[in-house]
């Protein structure tokens, strides 16, 4: 990484970045060498050089996370003190890519150390980590990439990976107008929002309002810290268990038809069905463990780039969380196609309300929350939801191409308790594969869910 021509820059993070700032986004990419030959597959020098050029184009990943004012955060890029990425390579001479394919990429046969389960980001750690696992006889490569969530959202993650791949494919061409342009400056998003939905200018600490806000903020932060300690961390790797499920196309069609029979005027999406199915399964499990029947709340992300005109190549967090409440009455009956369909209709009704006013209201609330509690806001949000979702099904993970074609398999990993990630399915367009969901729960909850078979009628477990 010597010789990087980087200028000093400061990126002020938005409230939407600060909420998940304690986490990494992590994915494993499986690349098969389909044309074996004398040349090394996905050469180390090519990967490193193209990464160098991609970071030159996206310097936010070379910065350090810093506290700013009372509860704000920044990523500070200092050309004399760059936060260089972690880049490691391992060779596995006994593990052939064919073995992974024969076992349908079950994680039990992954390279050693490839399966990362801890989602937490170190406050002083690298914003980018890359672990390359080279398989026997140049048969393939497994690339595990982690990017700090404060720097990008899932779409920003994919955009950076595609940028890296572009520089790898065009390594011999000069940089010109065709190279990927990524927008990391958060002011890009604020340009599409009214002034009252933007961070206020800082006041003097001696201003009465600032002094009072500071006192209240300190008390709330102390309370949330104590609350978190009493409840336990939501993310420790030894207290979470994850599995990858697949919801077949015929199941989605059946549940969609059931919803149409209940309300012919509504058209539920695959996302609505997944939200309903996994939230109900989780709620039924918690009901058995706690013997309490109550309304359950799922938080469903809604990317608003296209809704208010934010450029698609903006890489910061750009989604609001919509709250879908499912009444306890749906837990009084077994988990059936009808109960899932009714819950999916509730999800669709909420998603349909996501207009510009809803987006602005959410961001105002996030601004107020950050002003009071800073990055402890994730504790606050955790108390408000039963199940959280991340919809990544439309993102171009399978278009990340370093010159040898896209990956055969992309696997999400290392998510927090109660998070369900809706993944893109492998294959051209994912047609006929259905929807894959990576679910993370506490072990006792996951064991109960699997033992009772709440998902058996609707899903297949991949691993």
Curated annotation (Swiss-Prot):
<comment type="pathway">
    <text>Mycotoxin biosynthesis.</text>
</comment>
<keyword id="KW-0808">Transferase</keyword>
<dbReference type="Pfam" id="PF02458">
    <property type="entry name" value="Transferase"/>
</dbReference>
<feature type="active site" description="Proton acceptor">
    <location>
        <position position="149"/>
    </location>
</feature>
<dbReference type="GO" id="GO:0016747">
    <property type="term" value="F:acyltransferase activity, transferring groups other than amino-acyl groups"/>
</dbReference>
<comment type="similarity">
    <text>Belongs to the plant acyltransferase family.</text>
</comment>
<dbReference type="GO" id="GO:1900812">
    <property type="term" value="P:helvolic acid biosynthetic process"/>
</dbReference>
<dbReference type="InterPro" id="IPR023213">
    <property type="entry name" value="CAT-like_dom_sf"/>
</dbReference>
<protein>
    <recommendedName>
        <fullName>Acyltransferase helD2</fullName>
        <ecNumber>2.3.1.-</ecNumber>
    </recommendedName>
</protein>
<keyword id="KW-0012">Acyltransferase</keyword>
<dbReference type="GO" id="GO:0019748">
    <property type="term" value="P:secondary metabolic process"/>
</dbReference>
<dbReference type="GO" id="GO:0044550">
    <property type="term" value="P:secondary metabolite biosynthetic process"/>
</dbReference>
<dbReference type="InterPro" id="IPR050317">
    <property type="entry name" value="Plant_Fungal_Acyltransferase"/>
</dbReference>
<feature type="active site" description="Proton acceptor">
    <location>
        <position position="401"/>
    </location>
</feature>
<comment type="function">
    <text>Acyltransferase; part of the gene cluster that mediates the biosynthesis of helvolic acid, an antibacterial nortriterpenoid. Protostadienol synthase helA cyclizes (3S)-oxidosqualene to (17Z)-protosta-17(20),24-dien-3-beta-ol (protostadienol). The synthesis of protostadienol is followed by several steps of monooxygenation, dehydrogenation, and acyl transfer to yield the final helvolic acid.</text>
</comment>
């Amino acid at each position: 990484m010597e010789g990087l021509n980087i200028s000093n820059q400061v990126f002020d993070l938005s409230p939407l970045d600060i909420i998940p700032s304690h986490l990494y986004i992590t994915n494993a990419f499986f690349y098969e060498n389909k044309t074996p030959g004398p040349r090394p597959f996905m050469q180390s020098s090519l990967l490193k050089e193209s990464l160098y050029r991609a970071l030159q184009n996206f310097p936010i990943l070379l910065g350090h996370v810093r506290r700013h004012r009372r509860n704000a955060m920044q990523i500070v890029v200092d050309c004399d003190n760059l936060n260089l990425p972690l880049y490691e390579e391992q060779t596995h001479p006994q593990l052939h890519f064919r073995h992974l394919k024969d076992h349908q990429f079950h994680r039990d046969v992954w390279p050693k150390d490839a399966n990362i389960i801890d989602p937490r980001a170190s406050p002083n750690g690298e914003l980018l980590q890359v672990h390359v696992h080279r398989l026997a006889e140049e048969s393939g490569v497994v690339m595990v990439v982690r990017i700090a969530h404060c720097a990008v959202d899932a779409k920003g993650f994919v955009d950076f990976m595609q940028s890296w791949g572009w520089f790898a494919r065009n390594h011999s061409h000069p940089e010109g107008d065709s190279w990927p342009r990524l927008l990391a400056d958060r002011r890009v998003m604020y340009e599409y929002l009214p002034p009252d939905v933007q961070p206020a200018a800082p006041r003097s600490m001696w201003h009465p309002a600032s002094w009072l806000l500071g006192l209240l903020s300190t008390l709330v932060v102390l309370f949330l810290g104590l609350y978190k300690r009493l409840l336990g961390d939501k993310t420790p790797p030894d207290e979470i268990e994850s599995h990858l499920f697949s919801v077949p196309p015929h199941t989605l069609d059946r549940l969609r038809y059931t919803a149409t029979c209940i309300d012919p005027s509504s058209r539920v999406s695959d996302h609505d069905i997944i939200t309903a199915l996994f939230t109900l399964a989780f709620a039924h499990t918690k009901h058995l463990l706690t013997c309490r029947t109550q309304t359950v709340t799922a938080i469903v992300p809604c990317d608003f780039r296209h809704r208010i005109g934010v450029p698609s190549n903006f890489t910061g967090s750009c989604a609001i969380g919509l709250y879908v409440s499912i009444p306890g009455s749906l837990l009084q009956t077994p988990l059936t196609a009808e109960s899932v369909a009714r819950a999916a209709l509730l999800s669709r009704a909420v998603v349909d309300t996501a207009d510009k006013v809803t987006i602005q209201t959410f961001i105002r609330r996030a601004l107020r929350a950050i002003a009071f509690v800073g990055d402890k806001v994730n504790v606050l949000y955790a108390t408000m939801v039963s199940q959280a979702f991340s919809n990544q099904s439309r993102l171009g993970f399978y278009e990340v191409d370093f010159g040898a074609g896209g990956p055969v398999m992309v696997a999400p990993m290392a998510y927090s308790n109660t998070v369900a990630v809706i993944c893109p399915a492998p294959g051209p367009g994912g047609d006929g594969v259905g929807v894959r969901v990576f679910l993370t729960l506490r072990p006792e909850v996951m064991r109960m869910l699997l033992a009772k078979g709440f998902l058996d009628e609707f899903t297949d477990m991949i691993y």
